[in-house]
Amino acid sequence: MPGKRHAIVIHSPHSGRAPQLEEALKLLQEAGIELVRVEPITSLNELPPQGATWLAQGIDLAIAAGGDGLVGGMIRHVIKTGPRLAILPLGTANDTARSLAIPQDLAGAVEVIVAGQEAAVDVGMALPTAASSSASGLSDEEEAGSDYFCHTLTIGLNVEFARLATSSEMRERFGAMTYPVAALEALRAHEPLEVVLKFEGLSGPASARQSEDELRYQVLQVAVINAPVFGGPLQLSIPGASVTDHLLDIVAVQGPDWKEIAAAIGQLFAGSEGTQGEASAGTTRHPAELTTLPGLHHWRASSVTISTPAGPCEVTLDGEVKGQTPITVRIAPEPLQVLVPASWQAQTAEAGR
C-alpha cells in the first residue's frame, strides 16, 4: 500500500490473546505504520461514531485488536464515514477474522494490514422495532436505535452462556475453564423458548419467497448469522453462507434430545443439509428451508423479525449482550470496508461470477 499509514488501535484488555498486544504493536511499527493512538474499547463507551473525527486527525486506518465482540463494537465508528478497518485477531475464537481468511499469527495479520486489499463486506444490523422496507435505507430514528454485528446475533441458550462467560467472577474463579463451565451451567439452567419468526427477502423457490407466514417454534436458540465460520480453530462453516451475498443465515435449534441436536449440527457444519427423507416424524418444514436435519431449521433471507410471546428476551450481538426482543435483523444498507488477504478477495470475486 503506498504512503505511510496512520492508525488508531482499539483493543480489548480482556480478550483471549490480550497479552500479545505489545508484540503486535511492535510489529505494526516495524512495518512502517504510525500508531497515532492506542486505546481500550471502553474509551469509546457513550461516544457517538468517531470515524469522521479520526479522519480529521489524519488517521486513515482503524485497527481492531481483539475478538469478534471488539470488531462488532468498532463497526459503528467506521462503516459510513471513517477509516478503513483492519483486524488483529487477539480474541479467543476470532471467527470474523477466520471468515475473511485473516491469518491468526501476528506476523501474518500485520502483513494483511500492510499489503492486503480493501473489501466491501456485509454487516448485520439489529433494530428494536421493525426495520424500514425501503431499499434506499433507514430513517434517522431507526438508525439511531440500531446496533451492528459482524458475525452472529443470537437469542436463547447463547445469551446465558455469554453472560456467564464474560462474568469477571467466573473468569477469576475458573480461568481457562471459564468457557466449558459456562456452557455446562447454561445448558443446565436453560429452558426452551417460544419464538415467532417473520422473514423478508427469503432465498429459495418463488413459491417459498412469496410466503408471508409467521412461523412459531419452541427453540433452544435462534442464530442469525452473517459471517460463516464458527468454532475458532475448528473452522466449522455454514454451507453456502457468505459475507458478500447480502443475505443472513437463520438457524433455529430445537430440542430436547441433545445427542440428536449435536449430530445434526455436526452434519450441518460438514456441509450436509439432509434430504427430504431424513426429516423427523411430525416435523413441519417451511418451503424455503435449506435443511431437513432433525432438530434444525435453516433459512436464508435479507431480514428477519424475531418476537417472543412470553415477553422480551435478551439478545447477543457478537457474543455481547445487547438489546432484547422484539427485534428486526437485516443486512446494513452500507457495507464495511475492511482489509483482507488478496487471495480471499480473488476467491470471493471468482465465486460471485
Model-predicted regions and their roles:
Residues 1-62, 72, 76, 134, ...:
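ATP/NTP phosphate-donor binding region
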